[in-house]
Amino acid sequence: MKIVIVLALVFFAGILAAGLFNIGLSATNEMEFCTNCHSMKIPLGEYQESLHYKNASGVRATCSDCHVPKPFVPKMIAKVMASKDVYHEILGTIDTPEKYEAYRWKMANAVWDKMRASNSRECRSCHEWDQMD
């Protein structure tokens, strides 16, 4: 009887942990999380002027659509790698427009390198290459 209770507790704890894990994943994919917790006011303004934000179709890409892989393992790797953003937020690496501009090329190259490494997987989740000019 005692083993049944322990197994039931482990089972329900596992369900709770999985639920909390999924809530955390979902929350960290929200635009508000990215733009409120990070020094991302400059890229937010640029994004809001882009076709990914405003377009005739009314479809809007969010931060996670372009920056977070859909497959589980690459997504987990991206989440772990993004922890460096917290470190740089604490340091104030890009907390002013001047610092952002000084660091922009390095950040852009890092994103382009990821795109090359994944064969633009995140772009292809929305775009059809043969329909792009």
Predicted regions and their residues:
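Short sequence/structural segments immediately N-terminal
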Residues: M1-D133
